[in-house]
Amino acid sequence: MMNANRLPTRILGLDPGLRRTGWGVLAVEGSRMTHIAHGVITPDEKAEFADRLLHLFEGITAVIEQHRPDEAAVEEVFLNTNAQSTLKLGHARAAALIAPARAGLLVAEYSTRLVKKAVVGTGAADKAQIGFMIARLLPTAGKTTADCADALAVAITHANLRVANRRVA
């Protein structure tokens, strides 16, 4: 999938969830970011657990095939007070990690707190603040759902940190 000759670099951001997995694709060239596309993958809540995970995997694979990103970034799981919910979210996250890895993409992972800090300036930002900043940073994205805004925030975080990490190395 990766195309070393293509500029700008395309980054897929993923906000995994069992009910809704948000995704967003950015084109990045230097410090300039351009919105390409975003959406939500929504498995049938009545489907068997394994089928819901398969739907997520296949949905992410379809996004990769359509938008041909060079790299991917996935938000890490936050610890929930309900261990069962956290475990199920971990399964959804696994689908979000495996699909881009299977496509040969570099896959980075970022904590929720780091994503919030990178996009809003504070690790304690709420969904409304993230949505506001996505509208400011990517005005061509238009109105986004919270899941899409989170996925685009993950992609922005990766875009910024991958450049910073190259400068350090």
UniProtKB/Swiss-Prot annotation:
InterPro entries: RNaseH-like_sf (IPR012337), RNaseH_sf (IPR036397), X-over_junc_endoDNase_Mg_BS (IPR020563), X-over_junc_endoDNase_RuvC (IPR002176). It catalyses: Endonucleolytic cleavage at a junction such as a reciprocal single-stranded crossover between two homologous DNA duplexes (Holliday junction). Mg(2+) 1 binds at D15, D147. It comes from the Bacteria. PROSITE patterns: RUVC. Disulfide bonds: none annotated. One of its GO terms (molecular function) is crossover junction DNA endonuclease activity. One of its GO terms (cellular component) is cytoplasm. It is found in: Cytoplasm. Belongs to the RuvC family. The RuvA-RuvB-RuvC complex processes Holliday junction (HJ) DNA during genetic recombination and DNA repair. Endonuclease that resolves HJ intermediates. Cleaves cruciform DNA by making single-stranded nicks across the HJ at symmetrical positions within the homologous arms, yielding a 5'-phosphate and a 3'-hydroxyl group; requires a central core of homology in the junction. The consensus cleavage sequence is 5'-(A/T)TT(C/G)-3'. Cleavage occurs on the 3'-side of the TT dinucleotide at the point of strand exchange. NCBIfam families: ruvC. This is Crossover junction endodeoxyribonuclease RuvC. The lineage of its organism: Bacteria, Pseudomonadati, Pseudomonadota, Alphaproteobacteria, Caulobacterales.
